[in-house]
Amino acid sequence: MAQRELYWMLSGSGATQHDRCARITPDVERMWSPWATDELGPMYGVQWRYGGPDGTYDAVRDVVGRLVANPTTKRAVWTAWQGYEVGSMRIPPCPVIWAWNVIGGRVNLDIFARSTDVVCGLPYDTLEGWMLIHLMANTLRTHGHAVTPGQLRFTTANAHVYCQNLDVWHRMLMPARVEKEIEFIPTKQGVLEFKGKGFKAVNYKAPIYSAKVVVV
């Protein structure tokens, strides 16, 4: 599901330049249905791909262009937070800043979140960040830059576990039994070509946890 949600965000979350409203598509219906049945407002993918009042600013494409032109740039940042539009969103974005740095040939990503549900949100946020790093590294290699995936640093201003998920949280903290080494196989697609599939996990057999999203 993380791949499909990332694709949903990278593709504009079902919005268009002239209709800047994120919509729940079949790819993310299970994840986003607690908040809405259809429209979510100008959130995530709208800010990423159809920014500004007229919807013409493509932040993802802008960042890709900056990194392709100069991988050492310190200006490769996109955001999902626009204060004047937060009131029109069904839920304000939790991760709000994605800042890129290429240092020593390694593609690094810093994600800053205003709020993080450690049980229901953090696993997706960090996995999607890891996938973004691989996608960006693929893009830069396609343009002749000798880079490899680097580090993901995730920072949150408010990490929390809701009371109804404390039991799940305690079980998640228990050491997992690993019978075989887990191998993650990244896709060869780039950021702008990603179609929501291609990443694979081999020998991954984690327990299934049932946690409830808290709508606040």
Regions from the language model: what does each represent?
Residues M1-V216:
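Terminal, non-catalytic protein-protein interaction segments that mediate quaternary/complex assembly
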